[in-house]
């Protein structure tokens, strides 16, 4: 996978196939790497990257702060993930694209629709995260990281984070103690040195705010309902059904997005035999709609 400086952040990405572009925000929560489209859970089963590239240019990437991509210590919101993806499309020369998200990737996908509707051909939201259990577990994740920093003291707390990540090599999703920048700390020594040099109290305040505002509701985060209700972009929603991907979160998005289609198929019946074809049908209709509108 090539690397480019995208929005000032070193970004690993890959372009697969040909046709209209699809920017694909990977599943995997806080470990959203391009390979998850092939290796994780339902995505390994439905094999979208065996089918979509036959008709579309699929842009897959390690999201900022994930995998081999870099990051920046700041109070990250969904708008930052949108800016990262937008800069990647700009780098590749794509003016408009379908935006697809899996899992937590649905949040910036929904945000795209309200922030840059003129650049979005359609939105695909596969297993959107959300629900009361998701909010609770997400806040617990940030709390565990903050507790680890606190337990190691003001002088050693951030160094302890770097030491842990260097030794264990786990992402924030795998071990909350390593925090939201664990993946970058693992492979970027200069970033790690700057991370340790921060004021630890200011850092803790930043993390508290990040966790509270990133996952701020008991349904699908990413965009405000009032903004989505005014969104005139075709959307395709596929529900999950577990503690991180409550079916209610998918239903909420369907309620809020006026031009959305809700594929009411149980998780067990989402297979390679039916899912890629259904998704390609939706994308073809969205392309036809955009063409008729002169998009």
Describe these PLM feature segments.
Residues 243-249:
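Conserved alpha/beta-hydrolase "acid-adjacent" motif
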Residues 114-115, 120-152:
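Flexible "cap/lid" loop of the alpha/beta hydrolase fold
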Residues 101-105, 109:
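Gly/Ala-rich beta-loop-alpha elbow adjacent to hydrolase catalytic centers
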Residues 255-295:
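Catalytic active-site module of serine/aspartate enzymes centered on a nucleophile-bearing elbow/loop
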Residues 180-223:
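Hydrophobic, aromatic-rich cap/lid helix
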Residues 230-231, 237-239:
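Short beta-strand/loop motif that positions the catalytic acidic residue
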Residues 6-70:
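Conserved HGGG/HGGXW glycine-rich cap/lid loop of the alpha/beta-hydrolase fold
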Residues 79-97:
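Conserved acidic catalytic loop of the alpha/beta-hydrolase fold
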């Amino acid at each position: 996978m090539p690397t480019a400086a995208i929005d000032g952040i070193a970004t690993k990405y890959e372009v697969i196939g040909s046709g209209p572009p699809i920017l694909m925000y990977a599943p995997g929560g806080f470990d959203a790497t391009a390979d998850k489209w092939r290796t994780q859970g339902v995505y390994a089963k439905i094999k979208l990257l065996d089918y979509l590239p036959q008709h579309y240019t699929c842009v897959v990437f390690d999201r900022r702060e994930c995998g081999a991509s870099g990051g920046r210590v700041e109070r990250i919101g969904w708008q930052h993930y949108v800016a990262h993806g937008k800069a990647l499309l700009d780098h590749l020369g794509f003016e408009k694209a379908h935006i697809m998200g899996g899992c937590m990737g649905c949040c910036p996908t929904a945000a795209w629709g309200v922030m840059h509707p003129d650049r979005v051909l359609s939105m695909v939201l596969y297993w959107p995260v959300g629900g009361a259990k998701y909010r609770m577990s997400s806040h617990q994740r940030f709390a565990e990281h903050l507790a680890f920093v606190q337990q190691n003291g003001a002088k050693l707390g951030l160094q302890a984070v770097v030491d842990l990540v260097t030794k264990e090599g786990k992402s924030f999703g795998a071990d909350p103690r390593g925090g939201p920048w664990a993946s970058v700390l693992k492979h970027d020594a200069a970033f790690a040195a700057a991370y340790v040099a921060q004021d630890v109290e200011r850092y803790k305040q930043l993390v508290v705010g990040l966790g509270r505002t990133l996952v701020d509701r008991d349904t699908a985060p990413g965009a405000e309902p009032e903004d989505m209700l005014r969104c005139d972009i075709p959307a395709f929603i596929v529900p999950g059904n577990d503690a991180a991907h409550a079916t209610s979160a998918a239903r909420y998005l369907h309620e809020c997005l006026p031009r959305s289609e809700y594929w009411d198929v149980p998780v067990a019946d989402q297979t390679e035999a039916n899912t890629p074809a259904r998704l390609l049908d939706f994308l073809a209709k969205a392309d036809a709609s955009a063409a008729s509108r002169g998009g």
